[in-house]
UniProtKB/Swiss-Prot annotation:
Keywords: Ribonucleoprotein, Ribosomal protein, RNA-binding, rRNA-binding. GO terms for molecular function: rRNA binding; structural constituent of ribosome. GO terms for cellular component: cytoplasm; ribonucleoprotein complex; ribosome. This is Large ribosomal subunit protein bL21. The gene is rplU. It holds the Pfam family Ribosomal_L21p. NCBIfam families: L21. It comes from Aeromonas salmonicida (strain A449). GO terms for biological process: translation. It comes from the Bacteria.
Length: 103
């Protein structure tokens, strides 16, 4: 059994017991979250596809940790002009463990 749900403007394909990194959520570690924006649920060979969401579909997850991803370096320069600009960015994320899928 797996499901596709939407969180933080992105779609995630998950199964029970899987740990997934999502965009940062303002929820404490150890809390339980319900995702109601379920786009598809698959059980064996049968599929339920929503238009846009599956009616009664829910993905339940437990927050495992919060953190920051690896640094992405941005470099901009103009040739022959002695101009160079460098910056870095680390995106915040929330790790969740999928505890239940229902449709």
């Amino acid at each position: 059994m797996y499901a596709v749900f939407q969180s933080g403007g992105k779609q995630h394909r998950v199964a029970e017991g899987q740990i997934v990194r999502l965009e940062k959520l303002n929820v404490e570690t150890g809390a339980t979250i319900d995702f109601n924006e379920v786009l598809m649920v698959a059980v064996g060979d049968t599929f339920k596809v929503g238009a846009p969401f599956v009616e009664g579909g829910k993905v339940v997850a437990e927050v495992v940790a919060h953190g920051r991803g690896e640094k992405v370096t941005i470099v901009k320069f103009r040739r022959r002009k002695h101009h160079r600009k460098q910056a870095g960015h680390r995106q915040w994320f929330t790790e969740v463990k999928i505890t239940g899928i229902s449709a």
